[in-house]
């Protein structure tokens, strides 16, 4: 037995690691080698915890990495991430020791390629705004009852189906003219401009005719420029400067309905009205048929009542004129007497009214200061009580006395020492900030 042990070479034995220590060593090595790190890929399994922290994976065809984005970094995002979206991340690479997983702690996130495109978008927006293309004074109101609606979009897009469905449901009697155009790609701006110019021609020709129509085409007095949602690259055609200048030349009100509610393009700022979606654009220009029928019936009733009242007044005047022609001298004497009595009553009423107003003003002048003081005193007392209650309920007072609020990596409060084994990552919220902690040895009471 002793010989067997003697055959072993202690010097050649490998270092035996504790699991947590090995995880920390690997994490330190990764941070020293790769941090800071930037990575591009698709979002997968995105979720936002009640604490505000975000957890997801970033992946491509070659692999995936688990990611954690804490609340402070998540609050700086200007968009809502979705699964399958291509993004660029920047952060610190390490190991989540509790699971031994490779993890990227994300410090910033943006859509892939968005940085340069967004800067280009902001520069163009600022220049066109300085030229006055976005001024509210040039925005026009929509016609209350359009005679014809022009639509510019892709003929195979879901946006067209949404628009046509909404218009047929709400205003099936209004004709719609579709001018197809490309809505994505390098050729899309020129295609959109050509489609708009064709509708502008129809609108101008219709404005010069008696009924607003052109031979073979209905009148056009409203235009919808629509497209479904997509990435900033997908919607980039609607940020074209030539398209923006074409939009502001529209002879009739133009509504843009590009993307989703959170998407904004240069076309939105140039249009007379911006709708959050293509369906909303159609609804803005189309009051339901029931609303217009009700309005027409109401106007018809008012017109009939007005005509009847006019006829009644004229008949009454005719009757009175006939009576006066019978005895004009007696009627004149009665009118003079009646006028004299009315003038006397009016003078007397005015004197009484002025006297009452004078007495009332004197009374109010005496009562107003005292009433105001009492009201101000009551409000000041109520405000002081509310301020004291707020101060007593302020959790920061507890933190300022040296206490701290501990949360785990998931943002859940830690209230028991046994729930935080060695190596657990915690965050301590203090009165003036927070600390990231790692448990070395819990001590139970």
Curated annotation (Swiss-Prot):
Subcellular location(s) per record: Cytoplasm
Subunit structure: Heterooligomer composed of large and small subunits.
Superkingdom, natural source: Bacteria
HAMAP family: Exonuc_7_L
GO molecular function: exodeoxyribonuclease VII activity; nucleic acid binding
Family that this chain belongs to: Belongs to the XseA family.
Listed EC numbers: 3.1.11.6
InterPro entries: Exonuc_VII_L, Exonuc_VII_lsu_C, OB-fold_nuc-bd_dom
Enzyme class, broadest EC rank: hydrolase
Database matches in PANTHER family: EXODEOXYRIBONUCLEASE 7 LARGE SUBUNIT (PTHR30008:SF0)
Keyword Cytoplasm: yes
Keywords: Cytoplasm, Exonuclease, Hydrolase, Nuclease
The name this protein goes by in its record: Exodeoxyribonuclease 7 large subunit
GO cellular component, one term: cytoplasm
Swiss-Prot/TrEMBL catalytic activity: Exonucleolytic cleavage in either 5'- to 3'- or 3'- to 5'-direction to yield nucleoside 5'-phosphates
Role description: Bidirectionally degrades single-stranded DNA into large acid-insoluble oligonucleotides, which are then degraded further into small acid-soluble oligonucleotides.
């Amino acid at each position: 037995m002793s010989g067997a042990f003697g055959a072993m070479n202690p010097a050649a034995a490998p270092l035996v690691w504790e699991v947590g220590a090995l995880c920390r060593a690997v994490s330190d090595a990764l941070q020293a080698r790769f941090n800071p790190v930037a990575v591009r890929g698709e979002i997968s399994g995105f979720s936002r915890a009640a604490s505000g922290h975000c957890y997801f994976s970033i992946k491509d065809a070659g692999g995936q990495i688990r990611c954690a984005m804490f609340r402070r970094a998540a609050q700086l995002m200007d968009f809502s991430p979705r699964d399958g979206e291509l993004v660029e991340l920047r952060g610190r690479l390490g190991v989540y020791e509790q699971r031994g997983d490779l993890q990227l702690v994300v410090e910033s996130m943006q859509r892939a390629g968005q940085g340069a495109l967004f800067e280009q978008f902001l520069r163009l927006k600022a220049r066109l705004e300085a030229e006055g293309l976005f001024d509210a004074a040039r925005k026009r109101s929509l016609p209350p009852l359009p005679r014809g609606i022009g639509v510019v979009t892709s003929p195979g897009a879901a946006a067209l189906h949404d628009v046509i469905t909404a218009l047929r449901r709400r205003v099936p009697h209004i004709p719609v003219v579709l001018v197809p155009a490309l809505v994505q790609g390098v050729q899309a701006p020129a295609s959109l401009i050509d489609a708009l110019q064709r509708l502008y021609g129809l609108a101008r020709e219709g404005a010069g005719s008696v009924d607003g129509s052109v031979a073979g085409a209905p009148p056009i007095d409203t235009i919808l420029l629509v497209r479904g949602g997509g990435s900033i690259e997908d919607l980039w055609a609607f940020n074209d400067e030539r398209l923006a200048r074409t939009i502001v030349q529209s002879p009739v009100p133009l509504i843009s309905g590009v993307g989703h509610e959170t998407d904004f393009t240069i076309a939105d700022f140039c249009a007379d009205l911006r709708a959050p979606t293509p369906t909303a654009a159609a609804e803005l220009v189309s009051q339901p048929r029931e609303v217009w029928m009700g309005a027409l019936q109401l106007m018809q009733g008012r017109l009939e009542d007005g005509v009847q009242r006019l006829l009644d007044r004229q008949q009454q005047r005719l009757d009175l004129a006939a009576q006066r022609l019978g005895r004009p001298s007696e009627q004149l004497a009665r009118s003079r007497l009646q006028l004299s009595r009315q003038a006397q009553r009016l003078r007397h009423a005015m004197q009484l009214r002025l006297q009452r107003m004078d007495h009332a003003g004197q009374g109010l002048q005496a009562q107003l200061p005292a009433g105001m003081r009492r009201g101000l005193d009551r409000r000041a007392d109520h405000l002081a009580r509310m301020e004291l209650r707020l101060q007593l309920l302020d959790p920061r007072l507890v933190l300022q006395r040296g206490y701290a609020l501990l949360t785990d990596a998931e943002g859940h409060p830690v209230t028991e020492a046994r729930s935080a084994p060695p190596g657990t990552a915690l965050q301590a919220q203090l009165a003036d900030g927070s600390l990231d902690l790692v448990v070395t040895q819990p001590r139970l009471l």
